[in-house]
A protein has these predicted regions:
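Short alpha-helical transmembrane segments in multi-pass integral membrane proteins
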Residues: 1-32, 90-157, 188, 199-255, ...
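Residue-level signal for short hydrophobic patches within transmembrane helices
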Residues: 21, 25-44, 48, 71-78, ...
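Transmembrane helical elements of multi-pass membrane transporters/channels
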Residues: 30-49, 151, 185, 214-218, ...
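Helix-terminus/linker motif at the lipid-water interface of multi-pass membrane proteins
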Residues: 44-62, 132-139, 195-202, 262-293, ...
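Membrane-helix interface/capping residues of multi-pass secondary transporters
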Residues: 50, 59-62, 99, 128, ...
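Small-residue hotspots at the loop-to-helix junctions and early N-terminal turns
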Residues: 59-70, 146-149, 208, 284-299, ...
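Small-residue-rich hydrophobic transmembrane alpha-helices
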Residues: 62-122, 159-178, 272, 290-347, ...
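Short runs within selected transmembrane alpha-helices of multi-pass transporters and secretion channels
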Residues: 83, 152-170, 178-186, 207-222, ...
Length: 461
């Protein structure tokens, strides 16, 4: 197989990449800080969106959006799975100087993303009423819930495509381009939210249309950046119909992300269902309080996701180059920094939830219920970074099975069973204790398993 001059130039640049030679802490921060900033700016719209809905429309509208939020999250989870699986392969191929393979994977991911989006969104749209029944969405919230989720479902294919391009930037070691796209989408979303909700008075549908319009403009910007060479991988039309094995690799490597993000959606759905059935008398204010706390949690969790994304890229590059000691150092640095952030977030959510909720609503019942939930549910957040960093580590190394196992262990082996058993054994309020127990147990297991695996890898080589 011949190698072109352009490919040789790219290979030489990768061999001299500071990701393979520079100080681990510095390189981790180089990748993490822009990614975190981009995610925080991008995630700000989720926080502000909830704020505008609560203040501009009302607490009931916030409850309606919260009730169907699991649907939106599962769409995001599947999109993220495809992008993360592609990025894991691309970063390892670039680290191993396999430019042609990296280009092929990047290009093939678009066909998989578009087909997945069309199929998933069509099925969801056709079965919305059944999904409402499955989630036990209160009848009083269903009309507004439908107004919000319908535009999201109809046009989320835009989000799938945009995500593939930005993940390509990230896998190339260019998080600044990724941040530019995500930041633009977030800022536009906030501005359009204000316009559609407060000026045009479109209600909860305005929040949904603001998201779709902002994503559309962000996609145009992402395409422009890609065409200008901001990514180390190039789109090749002939690779759209790549062998099935290429798509299967992406799916297998992205599966841990689906289990993690999808697990979050399942937990949200299970919580909404539990509130609607176990706490029937206070279901609406509880769903609203829980929805507000979830938005705050998601915003404060974004730095940990950014660290995981940075670790995945750094570990992928060094693993592909055979630098296993650097892989371990990167993992330990990521765990340390994420733990520090976890302590800060635990303090904010557990001890200061009342002022966070007060930003969204003046309803005394919603505020009191939110304080009671937060004090218990977020007590184990300090260890949350261990699971995420371990998942990012194994994804970067291309080891789908351990990454999948670690994500599944916390959510499906620990949390969901605890959510079912604890309320039956100790009463309805015990539901909230499921979260810190699963966080601590899952985090300790993930940390121990990851260090054991890395030590064995280093010893063998």
């Amino acid at each position: 197989m011949s190698t072109t001059t352009a490919e040789m130039s790219t290979i030489d640049e990768q061999a001299d990449s500071p990701l393979l030679t520079g100080p681990i802490f510095k390189q981790f921060c180089f990748l993490a800080i822009p990614t975190i900033l981009g995610m925080v700016i991008n995630g700000l719209y989720t926080f502000v969106d909830a704020l505008f809905i609560s203040q501009g429309i009302g607490a009931q509208a916030m409850g309606a959006v919260s009730a169907v939020f699991p649907i939106q999250m599962i769409l995001i989870a599947i999109s993220t799975m495809l992008g993360s699986g592609m990025a894991s392969l691309v970063s390892r191929y670039l680290g191993a100087k396999r430019q042609k393979d990296a280009d092929e994977v990047f290009s093939a991911s678009f066909m998989l993303a578009i087909l997945s989006a069309l199929l998933l969104c069509t099925l969801t749209y056709l079965n919305l009423n059944s999904i409402f029944s499955l989630l036990a969405v209160p009848e009083s919230l269903q009309a507004q819930a439908s107004s919000y989720i319908t535009p999201i479902v109809m046009f989320w294919v835009i989000g799938f495509i945009c995500n593939q391009i930005t993940e390509g930037f990230r896998a190339s070691g260019n998080p600044k381009a990724m941040m530019q796209v995500l930041s633009t989408a977030s800022i536009l979303n906030i501005l359009l939210d204000a316009l559609f909700i407060f000026v045009f008075e479109w209600g909860v549908a305005g929040a949904a249309w603001a998201t779709i319009c902002a994503l559309s403009i962000a996609l145009v910007i992402a395409i422009q950046l890609q065409s200008k060479g901001e990514s180390a991988v190039k789109f090749q039309r002939r690779s759209l119909l790549s062998p099935v094995q290429v798509h299967l690799k992406m799916l297998s490597l992205g599966l841990p992300v689906l289990l993690s993000h999808g697990g979050f959606s399942v937990i949200l759905a299970a919580t909404v269902y539990s509130i609607s059935t176990v706490f029937a008398q206070n279901s609406e204010p509880l769903i609203t309080a829980h929805g507000i706390l979830v938005r705050c949690y998601m915003f404060l969790f974004l730095p940990i996701i950014g660290m995981m994304v940075a670790l995945q890229t750094l570990a992928g590059f060094n693993y592909g180059a055979g630098e296993f000691e650097r892989v371990k150092k990167a993992y330990l640095v990521a765990c340390l920094i994420s733990t520090v952030w976890g302590v800060i977030v635990t303090f904010i959510l557990c001890l200061n939830a009342h002022w966070l909720i007060a930003l969204f609503t003046s309803d005394a019942l919603v505020t009191e219920l939110g304080k009671e939930i937060a004090l218990v549910a977020f007590a184990g957040f300090t260890t949350a970074g261990f699971c995420m960093m371990s998942s990012g580590l194994f994804q970067g190394m291309g080891k789908a099975i351990p990454a999948t196992m670690l994500d599944a262990a916390r959510t499906y082996v620990l949390l969901l069973p605890l959510m079912v058993t604890l309320p039956n054994l100790y009463g309805s309020d015990a539901l909230w204790w499921s979260f810190p127990i699963a966080d601590v147990a899952g985090g300790v297991f993930a940390l121990s398993f990851s260090i054991f695996t890395l030590n064995r890898l280093i010893k063998k080589n």
